[in-house]
Amino acid sequence: MKTSIIPAIGKTALITSIFALIALNYGFKTEMSEQEWLNWSNKCLSNSFNPTPDINLKKWEITLTGDYFLRLRKTYQQGKQEYFSFNLHRLTNVDYLGSDTTGTLKFNTQTDDIIVQTYEDPEGNIDSMATSLGLPVHNMNTMRFDSLKIALNYFRMKSL
C-alpha cells in the first residue's frame, strides 16, 4: 500500500498556501486602466475645484474627456458663460501655488493652445487663445497634486 510522505495536515497547509499565493498574485493590479485614471482625475478635479472666489458664479462644470481635453465651463448669475478648453498633449507644465487648504492649479501649454470663449457677455463675447489657465482649488495636498500630475502626464503621453 502506498502512503503519502506528506501528512494530512501538511497537505491541507500546502493546498491553502498555494491558494493564498494565487489569490495574492492575481488579487492586485500593477497599474490602473485608462478608464480608472479618467474617473479618478475627473473626481479629483471636481472635488478640488473651488468656486468661492467667484461670488457671482451660478454653476460650473469641469471635465477631462476621453479624447484628452480638459474643459471648464462657468455660468454666472447674469447668464454670462466662460468656457476654457485645451488638449493635454499641448500641456507643458502643471504647477500648484498655495497651501494644503487653498491654492491655484496653473496649467501651461506650448503656445496659445487654451481656447477661451465667453457667451452672453454684456461687454461683448470673446473668442481667443491663452497660454496658461489658473484653476482655484481647495484641499489639494502634496500627494493629491502629485497623483493628479501623474494622471495628466499619463494622458498627455497617451495622446501623442
Please place each PLM-identified region on the residue numbering.
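Bacterial Sec-dependent N-terminal signal peptides
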Residues: 1-37
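N-terminal secretory signal peptides
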Residues: 28-85, 93-94
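Sec/Tat-exported extracytoplasmic proteins
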Residues: 48-52, 92-98, 152-159
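Hydrophobic residues embedded in beta-strands of well-ordered beta-sheets
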Residues: 67-70, 101-105
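A mature extracytoplasmic/lumenal domain signature
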Residues: 74-76, 87-92, 98-100, 109-113, ...
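Well-ordered beta-strand positions in beta-sheet-rich domains
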Residues: 83-88, 132-134
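Short, surface-exposed polybasic-and-hydrophobic patches located at secondary-structure transitions
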Residues: 102-122
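C-terminal partner/receptor-binding element of secreted or periplasmic proteins
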Residues: 124-160
